[in-house]
A protein has these predicted regions:
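Alpha-helical scaffolding within the catalytic cores
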Residues: 244, 282-298, 331, 662-667
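Alpha/beta-hydrolase
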Residues: 140-143, 172-174, 262, 495-496, ...
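Alpha/beta-hydrolase-fold serine-hydrolase catalytic core, especially in secreted/extracellular enzymes
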Residues: 21-121, 300, 307-492, 498-516, ...
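Primarily recognizes the serine-hydrolase "nucleophile elbow" in alpha/beta-hydrolase
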Residues: 218-288, 589-661
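Bacterial N-terminal signal peptides
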Residues: 7-16
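Gly/Ser-rich "nucleophile elbow"/oxyanion-hole loop immediately N-terminal to the catalytic nucleophile
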Residues: 131-134, 187-239, 256, 537-609
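Short amphipathic alpha-helix adjacent to the substrate-entry channel of hydrolases
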Residues: 153-170, 503-519
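Short beta-strand element of the alpha/beta-hydrolase
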Residues: 126-128, 134-144, 488-497
Length: 690
């Protein structure tokens, strides 16, 4: 009784003495920096660089050909088409004729529409000679991040000049381009075909990269089946995102004889060095377990020309940075087959990120050479066709990436929770093991707690640490308690989506109640995030300069914060899950706190959906570690991510592959028992927020 009275006296004394100044005092303590974004980014880069999938040793031609075949199958089945219905993968091409544009200049344009998956159509344009006999080589041209134009001028120039050299050219309209541009800001969920919306497909258990791959492969299927096309002389090319489509398809589908990707894909090491090279989310399918160096090696011995800019105003992945990984390391694979002359690298001397005349002429030369056509050095002038003429009829209820993801989520059915106690215990244990597998949980203990700052004044004691875990990654933490509080009892771990510096008012309220607190910034939150304050973009000077150069660059970069890019790399090449890493840090920090202090019970207090879900995962993995979880500003279901929607830029760790397919929050609550959950009113959808 005397202990309780003393505690109450100390708490009252601190509260009364500090009064209105308490929040400011706590705010100053919580704003004490523990690590700069550059430090966090360095740790992540080191962590990832140690996990870049190794490029296989070439060996001999027969062995490498067999290895290449096996790797293609594994990449398609285990990663790209993960969760896909077999009927969607194997369905034949479904193209419809939408009319012919007769130019009267020796070529015509056949307008087409085609179905990617049931209910999801896009357009295509086949350039072909007006009169032709026999079979000719054909090239599929992939569009980059173009958005507005139905068919970019540079692709029209390419197509006409390919035809005048004796080739057919099929242009495929990409997601969020041309008639698939769904309006709104390019990188917001209101624009339902924005590529980052593919993250909802991953969350629902169906690889988004499979959608992009299938859209590309359907074009190849169509070309290969045309009676006037030579199936042994098929090519692929594209700029930027079109280059990514070129390498992913041509590496994994051996029907592509010759390929010319232009400025748009990079080795993982390059992506880690300069995170502007990571690409959009489709570039990084979860559990890919292969580097783009391997995809380039899978092209051997087929003819391949890599084109990059010596300088590039849009990408930091320029020729000097990409050549060592994607050309120099790959040349030995061509040497196996004595086909070194089939593998070329061209550095465009002009500072452009375009399929400009320099790059187009290189592609004309390369395809003509390897398709056995006479060389033509000059480019032919082209009349550009306008969007109105190129328009095709697409279904009024055509699917979008976001709507497809929502449809997939709506079809998810999970195992019911058993009603009898014995079966329920078995179910709980089984689901906990499944959770460990889905979030790829690996225990992490604190290797060293680096003391950063401390204070003891105004009736408050505080100690701030950088918690270094055994895997080399860090969290930031501040321990607070009223001066003179009695030993023992419980402590509360406070998590806040925006970082602990935003929790000052709530922390003050808890301290006034006499609570002992550990406020924590887990990986990717607060000052344990690589994102810069005031700008969610990377730290390199060149990227900041790019953002200053024009509005398009700024918009593109702002929506690609390092936290999202590194989350993508962790899932794709490192076979990690950010949510698993964060849950492991929370469990590790809790264990460290119990070991270093006299507390005998731990609670968690969260604000925001990110902190809520990470805490629920941690409690479900270690149900005996925490007594109570108090949730503020959270949600009742992960379906909220789809319906609101919440973007991957807002909550990168929540978009882990299969997470929603296997679990919702009601199941996590049961698995976390005996941890008690106390949840206040859920957060309203951000779209309706005032």
């Amino acid at each position: 009784m005397r202990r309780r009275a003393l505690t109450a006296i100390f708490v009252f004394a601190w509260s009364a003495a500090a009064g209105a100044q308490t929040v400011q005092q706590v705010q100053e303590i919580l704003e004490e920096p523990t690590q700069a974004p550059e430090v966090v980014e360095y740790q992540l880069r080191q962590y990832l660089m140690n996990r870049v999938p190794a490029l296989p040793t070439p060996g001999d031609p027969k062995r490498w050909s067999q290895t290449a075949h096996e790797r293609r199958q594994r990449l398609l089945e285990d990663s790209i088409f993960h969760g896909w219905p077999r009927s969607w993968i194997d369905s034949p091409p479904n193209f419809t004729d939408q009319g012919i544009i007769v130019t009267g200049k020796g070529y015509q344009i056949q307008k087409l529409s085609y179905e990617i998956v049931p209910g999801f159509w896009t357009s295509a344009f086949l350039y072909e000679p007006e009169h032709m006999t026999g079979r000719a080589p054909a090239i599929v041209i992939f569009e980059g991040h173009n958005q507005r134009a139905f068919l970019p001028e540079e692709q029209q120039r390419l197509s006409v000049n390919y035809v005048r050299r004796g080739m057919l050219a099929l242009n495929l309209v990409w997601f969020n381009c041309g008639q698939l541009f769904t309006g709104g800001e390019p990188y917001t969920p209101e624009n339902e075909n924005a590529h980052w919306n593919g993250s909802y497909m991953n969350l629902a258990g169906t690889s988004a990269t499979g959608l992009f791959y299938l859209a590309a492969r359907k074009g190849l299927d169509y070309l290969a089946g045309l009676p006037n096309v030579d199936p042994h002389r098929l090519g692929a090319t594209g700029l930027s995102g079109g280059a990514w489509q070129t390498i992913i398809l041509s590496a994994l589908d051996e029907r592509v004889t010759a390929a010319v990707p232009v400025s748009g894909y990079f080795a993982f090491a390059s992506a880690i060095e300069r995170n502007g090279d990571v690409g959009d989310m489709e570039y990084n399918p979860p559990d890919f377990d292969a580097d783009y160096t391997l995809l380039t090696a899978l092209r051997a011995p087929r003819p391949t020309l890599l084109i990059y800019g010596s300088e590039d105003p849009f990408y930091v992945g320029r020729a000097p940075f990409t050549k060592p990984y994607l050309y120099d390391q790959i040349l030995p694979f061509y040497h196996l087959y004595h086909k070194e002359d089939f593998f070329e690298f061209h550095a465009n001397p002009h500072p452009v990120h375009r399929y400009d005349e320099e790059n187009r002429k290189e592609s004309y030369r390369f395809f003509s050479q390897h398709f056995g056509l006479p060389p033509v050095s000059e480019e032919i002038a082209v009349d550009v066709i306008n969007d109105q003429t190129l328009s095709v009829n697409l279904p009024t209820d055509n699917l979008t990436i976001l709507r497809l993801a929502r449809n997939l989520a709506d079809k998810i059915k999970r195992e019911a929770v058993p009603s009898d106690a014995s079966s329920r215990d078995q179910w709980t244990q089984s689901r906990r093991q499944k959770l460990e597998h889905v979030v790829l949980y690996h225990p992490q203990h604190v290797k060293h707690a680096w003391g950063v700052a401390n204070s003891k004044n105004g009736g408050l004691e505080a100690e701030t640490y950088r918690l270094e875990f055994v895997n080399g990654l860090s969290a930031s933490a501040t321990w607070l308690q009223p001066t003179g509080v009695q030993p023992g009892g419980s402590a509360t771990i406070v998590l806040q989506d925006e970082g602990r510096s935003h929790a000052a008012q709530h922390v003050t309220d808890l301290l006034r109640r006499g609570e002992k607190l550990l406020t924590v910034d887990l990986l990717f939150t607060g000052d344990a995030s690589p994102d810069r304050k005031g700008s969610p973009r990377a730290n390199e000077h060149v990227l900041i300069k790019m953002a200053e150069e024009n509005e398009h660059n700024r918009e593109w970069l702002v929506n690609r914060p390092p936290s999202v890019l590194y989350t993508q790399l962790l899932e794709s090449m490192a076979r990690e899950r950010s949510i698993g890493l964060e849950a492991a840090q929370l469990i590790g920090a809790a264990s460290w706190l119990k070991d270093r202090s006299d507390v005998n019970e731990l609670n968690i207090d969260t604000y925001g959906i990110r902190s809520q879900v990470v805490a629920m995962v941690a409690a479900a993995l270690k149900p005996d570690l925490f007594r109570q979880l108090t949730i503020r500003g959270g949600t009742n279901s992960l379906k909220y991510l789809f319906s609101c929607p919440i973007t991957i830029q807002e909550a990168p760790e929540l978009f882990s592959r299969d997470f929603y397919k296997e679990f919702d929050l009601d199941q996590l609550k049961i698995i976390a028992s005996p941890t008690r959950l106390d949840q206040s009113e859920p957060r309203p959808c951000r779209i309706t927020d005032p």
